[in-house]
Amino acid sequence: MKTEQRIWTSEKGWDHSEAKINDAQLVLIFIGIEVENQDTLLTSLKSTYPNADLVFCSTAGEIAKDEILDNSAVCTAIHFNQTPIKIKRIEINHTDESESCGIAIANALRADDLKGLFIISEGTITNGDFLVKGVNENIPSSVLVTGGLAGDAGRFTQTFVGVNEIARPGVIVAIGFYGDEIEMSHGSQGGWSEFGPIRTVTSSDKNVLYTLDNGNALELYKRYLGERADELPGAALLFPLCIINEDGSQLVRTILSIDEEKGSMTFAGNIPNGSKVQFMMANFEHLIEGAEMAAAQNASLHQPTLAILISCVGRRIVLGQRTEEELDAVIERIGEQTVYCGFYSNGEISPLRDRVSCALHNQTMTITTFKEKGDILA
């Protein structure tokens, strides 16, 4: 397995790095939403990597090595020596199609030797919970499923995904990796701090929360925020909600919007009736430690060739100028010889624990690592 990384901007074109892996089968392009001349970029990539599938994904910030960029295209070309890949592209027009899209992905890519799926979904229409439900219920639990929801610089209005085309709205792309030669690992952690008592969801509809402990959820949330309540909905990124599963594992949910008239809160993932939840708040040190813990979960894969980092846009907003510290924590744990790429997202897809069904996450650092047997890093 060989990789190379090049960076392209509208103003300067390509950086000074030279393309060497012309026989790549896959190129991942994480791209800012304001990058212009994408047709020129697409033409250049097709010429340089004629045999590769070119997968585009818009971002809320591009990750290249140890840097966070804006309005660039971070292009990572990958040549697999012994691993077949297969790609499924599907269009989604309405949120209600999310589960059927997941089923279609699973049916298209399922095979006896399927080792892993990496999903890049548009990030505003798709209900990530139902998307992963459709996938989970139609592939073996031994298949690792990871990925993320495209970003749009924190606007939550329209994201763009594509394969062998200029990225466009309403597209989901899934990549299947096959055979025994590919080794994949994952890690996902948040690092948020809980505050207040554990409460029960007493009224919700999919991703809309109405009441907690039979009381108005929005009013309760505002009481917790105090003076910060005047900054809603923007301040909500600093105070997500934690769903506590029966086994003690946690899912973090970002608040996307509030409805003052209905007293409701809309989240970036489902909030099931009867679930136990707790409010959370930002702690800079814990967020950075969470990134390091996500990297530590990948320890089973020694010196991976490639690491794809998908971190939530909310983490970037909270960490501000300290955001690169979470990248430093990951690199220190995994190693400097690994090639790193990724993006800041509207949601992350990863199992909660090793080799259990994948789930939608918010506000996490999610890492997927790859290597082929026999890879030796320079």
Predicted regions and their residues:
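Small-residue-enriched flexible segments
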Residues: 1-48, 52-53, 57-320, 324-335, ...
